[in-house]
Amino acid sequence: MKIALIAHDKKKNDMVSFAYAYKPIFEQHELFATGTTGLRIMEATGLVITRYQSGPLGGDQEIGAMIAKNDLDMVIFFRDPLTAQPHEPDVNALLRLCDVYAIPLATNMASAEMLMHALERGDLDYRKLRK
C-alpha cells in the first residue's frame, strides 16, 4: 500500500518516534512524505521514502494530487491544532480530499496506531480492489 506521512513542525518528533515504532510494518509498504518530515524519518529509521516539497511550499498539494488520482491508500498527518499554519487552506484541502476519495486518515497518534494495526491485520486490503 502507498502511505503518506505528514507532520506539522511541533509534531515532527512524534512522527519520527511513531515511524521508528512501526518500522517493521512501514518497511512492507511504499512511503511518501512532505520534505522535512520525510528527511527526519529517513535519517532516524533508514526507511525509504519518496519526499515531496515541504508542506508550506506545496507538499500537501502534491500528496493531495496523489489522492485525486487514486494513487495513495492511507494518510497519517500529525497536525498541531494549537498553532496557526500559514498553509491552512492546503491542509484543509488535503483533509477534504481524503473524505471525498475515502482515504483512511489519522490526524493524531491514537488514530494512527489504530490504522497501523488495521493495516497489519489486512483490514485495509479493500483499497487494493479500488485500483
From Swiss-Prot:
GO biological process, one term: methylglyoxal biosynthetic process
Species: Bacillus cereus (strain ATCC 14579 / DSM 31 / CCUG 7414 / JCM 2152 / NBRC 15305 / NCIMB 9373 / NCTC 2599 / NRRL B-3711)
InterPro entries: Methylgl_synth, Methylglyoxal_synth_AS, MGS-like_dom, MGS-like_dom_sf
Domain of life: Bacteria
One annotated GO molecular function: methylglyoxal synthase activity
Record-given protein name: Methylglyoxal synthase
SUPFAM superfamilies found in the cross-reference section: Methylglyoxal synthase-like
Family: Belongs to the methylglyoxal synthase family.
Domain MGS-like: 1-131
Catalytic activity: dihydroxyacetone phosphate = methylglyoxal + phosphate
PROSITE patterns cross-referenced by the UniProt entry: METHYLGLYOXAL_SYNTH, MGS
Role: Catalyzes the formation of methylglyoxal from dihydroxyacetone phosphate.
Key words of the record: Lyase
Enzyme Commission number: 4.2.3.3
One cellular-component annotation, GO: cytosol
Residues that coordinate or bind substrate: 8, 12, 34-37, 54-55, 87
Encoding gene, per UniProt annotation: mgsA
Tagged with keyword 4Fe-4S: no
